[in-house]
Amino acid sequence: MIKVKLLKNGNDLKKIVIKGHAMYDDFGKDIVCAAVSSTVITSVNACLSIDDKSISYEEGDGIVINVIKNDYVTSKIIDNMISNLFELEKAYPKNVQIKEENNE
């Protein structure tokens, strides 16, 4: 299962952690994993191409996105990414899980 954790401080999104494999199909044939990956990578690239200091990210056992700037454009791109991930969670609840944590 792909697990997405949205870490907020109040209303501000600070970090997104994405780990796991969807297990929808074999490696290389998994459309759910491909959808999550393309959504996330496209969003990361869009943020960085507009402002390379808007976010930072680390790849390893998954991907960790740190939101540095919550400006209008960055927020819209990240909100769109999250909306797409929620749609994938609705369509594939056995393969994608999203949790939100608030550290106010």
Which residues does each predicted region cover?
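Short, conserved glycine- and acidic-residue-centered signature motifs
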Residues: 32-36
